[in-house]
Design a protein with these regions (language model features):
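Preference for long, amphipathic alpha-helical scaffolds in soluble/luminal domains
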Residues: 1-225
């Protein structure tokens, strides 16, 4: 079903959003890259890396929560969403050593260092951090370290971040990392989650199923399940 309707160029209807949604769904089900997945990644990478010189903060192309159902990405600039999602998908499907992927990570790493871990606003920032935490080398980069420290400075003692920080996506992203700063934040966030779990076992007020998936995945990353 996820492969149905794929165009000859590898995309689904020449749509960035639909192609990213299909690829993420395939990551959850197929796991290993196949020819259709490689073709879709090729289409997405060609578009993302063309757009990356430089990132365009085009307000008319902002990504909203409605575009992101069942995706680990959050509302923000189209450019950072496209690049972050593409690098994330390239890394989880085994393309982390591709020259273009490495070049894009290197440029984002330098940008993250220059901006002290804040590529953009908090929600938009998640889309870049999401790509960094799944890369074998860049998960330990200076930009990742700075982004994690930036989050630690705004997390309160209860384990929450400000409302502009996407809570469930942030917990899930940080759970991929082993740095002391990430571990401390995750531990505090888990205590908050323990206190706020719904009676039916889910989390959140809306998109409960997706929030719960992100929490369970984070718990598994930390070998607590």
């Amino acid at each position: 079903r996820l492969l149905s309707g794929q165009s000859d160029d590898g995309s689904w209807n020449q749509s960035v959003k639909t192609t990213i949604q299909r690829l993420f769904g395939l990551h959850l089900t197929v796991r290993n890259p196949t020819q259709p997945i490689d073709k879709a990644l090729g289409w997405l990478m060609a578009l993302a890396f063309k757009e990356y010189s430089p990132i365009r903060k085009d307000i008319s192309q902002r990504i909203t929560s409605r575009d992101l159902e069942n995706l680990p990405f959050t509302p923000g600039c189209f450019g950072y969403f496209l690049l972050g999602a593409t690098l994330f998908l390239a890394s989880i499907f085994g393309r982390e050593d591709d020259t273009r992927v490495q070049e894009a990570y290197a440029r984002l790493n330098q940008e993250g260092i220059k901006k002290k871990g804040r590529w953009c606003g908090w929600s938009c920032n998640n889309n870049v951090l999401r790509a960094f935490v799944v890369h074998p080398r860049y998960s330990e980069s200076r930009a990742t370290e700075l982004a994690v420290h930036a989050l630690s400075r705004v997390q309160d003692d209860s384990g929450k971040w400000p409302r502009v920080v996407p809570f469930y996506q942030t917990v899930n992203a940080l759970a991929h990392l082993d740095s002391p700063t990430a571990r401390r934040q995750v531990a505090k966030a888990f205590r908050h989650l323990l206190r706020t779990q719904n009676p039916d076992g889910t989390w959140g007020r809306s998109r409960k199923e997706w929030n719960t998936f992100l929490v369970v995945h984070a718990l598994r990353r930390k070998r607590l399940l």
